[in-house]
Curated annotation (Swiss-Prot):
SUPFAM superfamilies in the record: Formate/glycerate dehydrogenase catalytic domain-like (SSF52283), NAD(P)-binding Rossmann-fold domains (SSF51735)
Protein encoded by which gene: CtBP
InterPro entries given in the database record: CtBP, CTBP_dehydrogenase, D-isomer_2_OHA_DH_cat_dom, D-isomer_DH_CS, D-isomer_DH_NAD-bd, NAD(P)-bd_dom_sf
Function statement: Corepressor targeting diverse transcription regulators. Hairy-interacting protein required for embryonic segmentation and hairy-mediated transcriptional repression.
Presence of the UniProt keyword Oxidoreductase in the record: yes
Protein name: C-terminal-binding protein
Similarity annotation: Belongs to the D-isomer specific 2-hydroxyacid dehydrogenase family.
Chain segments carrying region Disordered: 445-476
UniProt keyword Transcription, yes or no: yes
Catalytic residues identified in the record: 266, 295, 315 (proton donor)
GO biological process, one term: positive regulation of canonical Wnt signaling pathway
Organism: Drosophila melanogaster
Length: 476
């Protein structure tokens, strides 16, 4: 067996410097798809790539130059990349999601097209955990509503008025906090909650035995048990097809009457209509949501618009000045690793690495071994005749047709050559792809940081598949 066939398939994005007596060589193009500020990314990438911003909400707003030439893309959570969107990019080799969630990217399609998808799962853990505790404390002590009463001019002249206004305030010590998911953020919340006197339990079917003992927590093995035992439920898991509307009519009935609910994970985990009804009926005493199924959240629209005892914040749990800088630096560094190294070897957080791994060889006709790629990764475009067949079509790394494997470096070189030919034709440069000082074709012109960034939700190692969900397929 040829041992080379068991090795990862490697792609390399070509990086060329200046020749002493020659023209400036074009660098790989990296695009920020749905933002404008590249001031943090530029110092990390400027010596190996040209950086452009698109400030787009969909691929229809992305300039043709980026679609044809970009080998790397940075993106927040405000743009969605479906398979059809991904096929518009002719030279793309890597996407880095500035955040932890990748639910706005068709990861499977990206892998089949030879595009590595990476995220930044480790940033903002402290910020989200702190925000979670802030929301929990507000629900228990009703600080948010009491502050609003004072702001509206209400006067408290005696204990009876205080008692009336603060009705529903609860003591924390001795209550049970139930965490759905005990990853980075869930663990951070657990440690903070214990300091306040909570009895902390958790449900996470994907963690090894003993994690509860190492943290001094109590583990339950079904979601029903967690909901039944918890005075406050806090969600800390990713969103996928298995746990969409995890909090629904059926699961709310499993909760203790008058329990609290907190969600700083993903909006789609909660069915808004069912939650609104539960708040009106008092089955859930109060709820706090930093994330919403439809964002940006509009307090005057949707099922929750007239729900009582509800705190909503604008998907900002992840944010602090320090975490925002850290997040963007980590994302840009991942792009840099892809440019100067081999994909997927150098990538720290590639979520579809399996599409770049070779499987054991299968016996071909005449006894010749043939390399097989999972899902046809990198193979599809090598034999495609669709209009989208650009430089991607040269990245069948295991093909022996045409003299052997072709690297991403050659693909990038082909894109550069095509761009050079296109440069001979007059074409206007859009305002958001402005010239950069120093001879680089594109760059940044704004230092305004995007205010709407993704949350760094901690995640379970896989999807939460619960008995409750299987039993509640009829729930809204």
């Amino acid at each position: 067996m040829d041992k080379n066939l068991m090795m990862p398939k490697r792609s390399r994005i070509d990086v060329k410097g200046n020749f002493a007596n020659g023209p400036l060589q074009a660098r790989p193009l990296v695009a920020l798809l749905d933002g404008r500020d590249c001031s943090i990314e530029m110092p990390i990438l400027k010596d190996v790539a040209t950086v452009a911003f698109c400030d787009a909400q969909s691929t229809s707003e992305i300039h043709e130059k980026v679609l044809n030439e970009a080998v790397g893309a940075l993106m927040w959570h405000t743009i969605i990349l479906t398979k059809e969107d991904l096929e518009k990019f002719k030279a793309l080799r890597i996407i880095v999601r500035i955040g932890s969630g990748t639910d706005n990217i068709d990861v499977k399609a990206a892998g089949e097209l030879g595009i590595a998808v990476c995220n930044v799962p480790g940033y903002g853990v402290e910020e989200v955990a702190d925000t979670t505790m802030c929301l929990i404390l507000n629900l228990y002590r009703r600080t948010y509503w009491l502050a609003n009463m004072v702001r509206e001019g209400k006067k408290f002249t005696g204990p009876e008025q205080v008692r009336e206004a603060a009705h529903g305030c609860a003591r924390i010590r001795g209550d049970t906090l139930g965490l759905v998911g005990l990853g980075r953020i869930g663990s951070a919340v657990a440690l903070r909650a214990k300091a306040f006197g909570f009895n902390v339990i958790f449900y996470d079917p994907y963690l090894p035995d003993g994690i509860d003992k190492s943290l001094g927590l109590t583990r339950v093995y079904t979601l029903q048990d967690l909901l039944f035992q918890s005075d406050c439920v806090s969600l800390h898991c990713t969103l996928n097809e298995h746990n969409h509307h995890l909090i629904n009519e059926f699961t709310i009935k499993q909760m203790r009457p008058g329990a609290f609910l907190v969600n700083t994970a993903r909006g789609g985990l909660v069915d808004d209509e069912t939650l609104a009804l539960a708040l009106k009926q008092g089955r859930i005493r109060a709820a706090a949501l930093d994330v919403h199924e439809n964002e940006p959240y509009n307090v005057f629209q949707g099922a929750l618009k007239d729900a009582p005892n509800l705190i909503c914040t604008p998907h900002a749990a992840f944010f602090s000045d320090a975490s925002a800088t850290e997040l963007r630096e980590m994302a840009a560094t991942e792009i840099r690793r892809a440019i100067v190294g081999n994909i997927p070897d150098v990538l720290r957080n590639c979520v579809n690495k399996e599409y770049f791994m070779r499987t054991p060889p299968a016996a071909a006709a005449g006894g010749v071994a043939a390399a097989v790629y999972p899902e046809g990764a990198l193979h599809h475009r090598a034999h495609s005749t669709t209009p989208h067949d650009g430089p991607h079509s040269t990245t069948n790394l295991g093909s022996t047709v045409g003299g052997g494997p072709t690297t991403v470096a050659q693909a990038a070189a082909a894109a550069v050559a095509a761009a050079a030919a296109a440069a001979l034709l007059p074409s206007p440069v859009p305002s958001h792809l402005s010239p950069q000082v120093g001879g680089l074709p594109l760059g940044i012109v704004s230092s305004q940081s995007p205010l709407s960034a993704p949350d760094p939700n901690n995640h379970l190692s896989s999807s939460i598949k619960t008995e409750v969900k299987a039993e509640s397929t009829e729930a809204p």
